[in-house]
Amino acid sequence: MIIIGCDYHPGFQEIAYVDTETGDCGEQRLEHGEGAQAFYRDLATQGKKVRVGMEASGHARWFERLLAELNIELWRGDAAVIRAKRGRKKKTDREDARHILNLLLTGDFPQIWVPSGENRDLRQLLWHRHRMVQARTRVMNQLQAVALNEGLRCKKKLWREHGREQLEAFRLAPWASRRREDLLQLLDRLNPTIAELTQAVEREAEKSPQAGQLMTHPGVGALTALAFVLIIGNAERFQCGKQISAYLGLVPLEDSSGERRRLGHITKQGNSLLRFLLVEAAQVSSRTIPEWRSKYIHLTMRRGRKIAKVAMARKLAVRLFWMMRKGWNYQQIVKFGSHVEQPEHRHGVQ
């Protein structure tokens, strides 16, 4: 078996490898493109099992496809854990490749869960819609500014038929008029695109039984449910609500020592899109569920609105996690609670 530690960069990769059968080892720098492809294709022809370990990266899709095509095993590792396991102060690309190879050989490589190709493609749908909505919001804000400069303040009514007629009727200077026309054209192109993407999200959510169960929770729509299912993946990876909160970056930073305990802002680790959607959905849930509404008002008075929103988002994330893990809908999770059949754990924490 050939084991390879790969320090991956956008334009090249530094590798350190060893053949566990013959003991042959070496180091090499591979330029991406023909150089890397020729090296791995040559390995595949040798008839030996090959395992490549590298830090998780979002810019290596072509490399992952190449190794999958050649039936070469690829392990992705947690970059933060790999960095923490490095003992030497000297850091070079060659040292990093050696370090990854050593972790693979000793069995300490922190391998992480990797979503499937279909999962990743559906995430692109969610991100594309999210970016289109952000672009539309920027366009609408600029048009609101144009209306305010002309003394028209009608907020959401500006996007109705009468409001648009008022906006188009303003007599503006030449370049201001050009700006208004271009922004309106952009808005007219974005609206049908977003509507089409929203319908696609709803269709994909209908195909997923897990998303359908999550959508029974008040405030959780197709977008939030599908995003939660795609990003969490296998719910069995997590043992308790604290782990899911930490995975989504909804827990505070902590810098404690001795008797001093200092908590900061949330870590914001994990997927920012799902965190955003949970905050939005939690506000709707807080208006719908009486107990949550009381909790939200209490937190708002004690800690402020921003902290209260994040706290409710964390509460929603934990509840959706247990619904997904147990395969329950909203009525079942309310009736039986999150931690039924777990007498050995208190509050789901090991």
Residue ranges and their predicted role:
Residues 1-350:
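A detector of single, family-specific signature residues
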